[in-house]
C-alpha cells in the first residue's frame, strides 16, 4: 500500500468528506491545508441540476469577481481602427487583425484571454481549431465578442472569470488565491454563485445548485454549506 504524504495525512485528518462546511470554516480549512511552496489558487466546483446533453440546459457566461482572481491577465484583442486604440488604452497587451492571427498560427500565444469586435470574427473564425481547444475562442455569451472591446479588456483585467458546464454539468473556475482575506474569497464565491443563479436555464428543473466545493491547487475539495452564502439562499 502506498504511503500517504504528510499533506495527504493532514487532509484525511482534517476534512470530513460527508460534511458541508460553513463558508468561513471551509476557507479557514483551505488556508490551514495550503502547505505548498507557492501561493495556491482557490478553485471552485459547482454541481448544477442540469442535463448537459441538452443544449437548452448548458450554462455559460462570465462575471467580474469583486476582488479579482489574483492573476495578472494578458489580453489579446482582434479589432481595428478606433477600437484598436481604445483596446490599447484599456491595457490590452496585443492588438491587431491579420498580423495577430499570423502570430497565433505560428504558435505565439502569450495571452490568457482573447477578445474580438464583431467585424474581426472573419479573421478569428480561421483560428477556431487553435483557440477552441484552449478555451480561448471569443464568444458573445462570455462578453468576449463585443463592439465595446475597451470595456471587455477592463473586465478581463479586473478579474472576470468565464464559466461553462462540463459534460457532467459541473462548473469549474478560480475565485482567488489562498493568501486572499477570508472575506474576499467568500465575496468572490458569492458573486459567482449569484451569476450562476441568474444564468439558470428555463428548462432546468428541480434543485439547481446541487453542490458547491472549494479547494486549493494542491488540496482536496471542501463542501460548502450553501445556506452560509448570501447569494445561494
Swiss-Prot record:
Q: Which InterPro entries match?
A: Ribosom_uL1_bac-type, Ribosomal_uL1, Ribosomal_uL1-like, Ribosomal_uL1/biogenesis, Ribosomal_uL1_3-a/b-sand, Ribosomal_uL1_CS
Sorted alphabetically, the Gene Ontology cellular component annotations on this record are: cytosolic large ribosomal subunit
Q: Name one GO molecular function term.
A: structural constituent of ribosome
Q: Which Pfam families match?
A: Ribosomal_L1
Query: Which keywords describe this protein according to UniProt?
Result: Repressor, Ribonucleoprotein, Ribosomal protein, RNA-binding, rRNA-binding, Translation regulation, tRNA-binding
Q: Choose any GO biological process term that the UniProt entry carries and state it.
A: translation
Q: Which PANTHER family match?
A: 54S RIBOSOMAL PROTEIN L1, MITOCHONDRIAL (PTHR36427), LARGE RIBOSOMAL SUBUNIT PROTEIN UL1M (PTHR36427:SF3)
Family membership, please give it: Belongs to the universal ribosomal protein uL1 family.
Subunit and partners: Part of the 50S ribosomal subunit.
List the HAMAP family: Ribosomal_uL1_B
- Role played: Binds directly to 23S rRNA. The L1 stalk is quite mobile in the ribosome, and is involved in E site tRNA release.
The identity of this protein, by name, is Large ribosomal subunit protein uL1
Q: What is the lineage of its organism?
A: Bacteria, Pseudomonadati, Pseudomonadota, Gammaproteobacteria, Alteromonadales
* Name of the gene: rplA
